[in-house]
Amino acid sequence: MKMILSSCDFSNPNSKQVILDNLDKKLCECKVLFIPNQKATYEKIHSDKYYDRLIECGFGKRENIYIFDESESEKFKNLNIDIIYISGGNTFATLNKIRKANFDNEIKKYIKKGVIYIGGSCGAHIVTRNIEHLLKLEDNYINIMDFNALGLFDGVIVPHCEANEYTPELREKIYSELLKEKKYNVYKLTNAESLIVTEEKIIKKYRK
């Protein structure tokens, strides 16, 4: 199992380099299943939008890129892939979308089989123990009541710390409160930091 979790995945040069340093092969050779956030529509999924974005990130051939469509979730089981990638978005809505498609267990199966998971912000939260602390940071407009996430990462994350555009004082307060509760292992990340998670250890990385 290997998961690369960060605030900004490919949109920050430091976290992007950590991803590149921890893959089993060159990014351009990897086959990837990309799961878009809650804003994805049928039209966007079946357009060039996400393909162009992933190629810009460094993924290679279009035929090596799979864009998840929850209306056809069966098609995305048992793929021959190297990476599952979930980026930013509304965590509550994205987790709900994955659950409704009954794809949460499929993600777990892929990761346990050795597929590398890349999660940025929302994507990082998806594999943690719980997302209830995000009620202070994101709009739970779909009113989900089950805040347990996939539980593949033994802890919770407070991302985007120290970034002025992401209410750093509030994030520091949430981090301190979570530490006092002692319910979960708590990790905070700046926009440049990443966590490399394997079955044996968790490594915090900052790559210049």
Residue spans for each PLM region:
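Short, flexible loop segments at the rims of nucleotide/cofactor-binding pockets, characterized by
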Residues: 8-12, 62-66, 94-97, 136, ...
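N-terminal beta1-alpha1 cap of cysteine-dependent amidohydrolase-like domains
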Residues: 1-83
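Short, conserved acidic/polar surface loops in the N-terminal third of protein domains
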Residues: 44-45, 77-79, 94-98, 129
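Ordered, amphipathic secondary-structure segments that act as subunit-interaction surfaces
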Residues: 79, 83-89, 93
